[in-house]
Amino acid sequence: MASNKRYFSSSSSMLPWLGIAAVLVLLDQITKITITRLFVYGESHAVTSFFNLVLVYNKGAAFSFLASETGWQRYFFTIMGIGAAIFIIYLLKKHAGQRLFCWALALILGGAIGNVIDRVLYGHVIDFLDVHIGGWHWPAFNIADSAICIGAVLFIYDELRRVGK
């Protein structure tokens, strides 16, 4: 699951990783609060020819998966997010010295907590980053989603690197 290379002297050094996750949560929440104060729901402003800022709500998961359900998904994804956060904290404690693995976990943790906060407070996740090129349009996302995706890529890279040794 994680490479065996250690960069810190003790397994109790998970605090830097929790700090990274906390910074991501703050950045995610500050950007969401800012967008909700500056935009009304559905409002969009072009920043470049391929990037807009927009205010939309997602009651589902990634790519609005299950968004049209009756409301049970709010609780399901909240519980899943909290469970994932607890498991990630356990992994950070166990593998605190494994730098790349812990970067991946810290990014995923920060993103998961950022989106759980939205679900608990609002019943949906606030999305505001909108990328489109030609006829291709990516679903709106946020800082938390970006952190989760980058963390997942780092996790896969770390696993491939470890297996390749």
Curated annotation (Swiss-Prot):
Active site: 127, 145
Gene: lspA
HAMAP family per UniProt: LspA
Keywords: Aspartyl protease, Cell inner membrane, Cell membrane, Hydrolase, Membrane, Protease, Transmembrane, Transmembrane helix
Family: Belongs to the peptidase A8 family.
Catalytic activity: Release of signal peptides from bacterial membrane prolipoproteins. Hydrolyzes -Xaa-Yaa-Zaa-|-(S,diacylglyceryl)Cys-, in which Xaa is hydrophobic (preferably Leu), and Yaa (Ala or Ser) and Zaa (Gly or Ala) have small, neutral side chains
InterPro entries the UniProt entry points to: Peptidase_A8
Topological category with respect to the lipid bilayer: Multi-pass membrane protein
Organism: Janthinobacterium sp. (strain Marseille)
Subcellular location: Cell inner membrane
Residue intervals passing through the bilayer: 7-27, 46-66, 72-92, 100-120, 136-156
Purpose of the protein: This protein specifically catalyzes the removal of signal peptides from prolipoproteins.
GO MF annotations in UniProt: aspartic-type endopeptidase activity
GO cellular component labels: plasma membrane
EC number: 3.4.23.36
GO biological process, one term: proteolysis
Record pathway: Protein modification; lipoprotein biosynthesis (signal peptide cleavage)
Protein name: Lipoprotein signal peptidase
